[in-house]
């Protein structure tokens, strides 16, 4: 009788290790998601610092141009066009980190989605309905 119980426990232990051995079989822990978020924040800071280091002359040129002209020339239409071009250039520069941030957030969300599936959403629905599939937790 004890041998049967021991064999049963050994079998359950073996199944438990097989289910948890695959990366997709394990759910995301809170520490994993917090580490990804902190990594995302550090990357955003690094990107913004790198953009500021690469293009400090752009900010200086705009200030220099405005200071060198007298107040009468500031209202000149040509200067207004130049400022529009500088503003457009600035918006392009500042849009890069936001685009990169959105890509990183998409990556973070896809990792969360991918952690619960093995073959995709449709196959998961089929697997859940039929009892087949890799993450159904059965047998």
From Swiss-Prot:
Hormone playing a key role in cardiovascular homeostasis through regulation of natriuresis, diuresis, and vasodilation. Has a cGMP-stimulating activity. Pfam families: ANP. It comes from the Eukaryota. Residues 1-21 form the signal peptide. This is Natriuretic peptides A. GO terms for molecular function: hormone activity; hormone receptor binding. GO terms for cellular component: cytoplasm; extracellular space. Residues 22-114 form a propeptide. GO terms for biological process: blood vessel diameter maintenance; cGMP biosynthetic process; cGMP-mediated signaling; negative regulation of systemic arterial blood pressure; neuropeptide signaling pathway; receptor guanylyl cyclase signaling pathway.
């Amino acid at each position: 009788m004890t041998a049967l119980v021991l064999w049963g426990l050994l079998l359950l232990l073996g199944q438990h290790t097989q289910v948890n051995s695959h990366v997709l079989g394990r759910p995301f822990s809170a520490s994993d998601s917090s580490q990804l978020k902190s990594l995302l924040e550090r990357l955003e800071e690094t990107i913004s610092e790198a953009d500021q280091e690469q293009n400090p002359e752009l900010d200086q040129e705009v200030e220099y141009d405005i200071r060198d002209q007298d107040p009468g020339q500031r209202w000149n239409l040509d200067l207004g066009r130049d400022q529009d071009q500088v503003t457009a250039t600035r918006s392009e520069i500042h849009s890069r980190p936001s685009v990169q941030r959105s890509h990183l957030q998409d990556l973070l969300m896809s990792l969360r989605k991918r952690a619960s599936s093995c073959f995709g959403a449709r196959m998961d629905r089929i697997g859940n309905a039929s009892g087949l599939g890799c993450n159904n937790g059965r047998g």
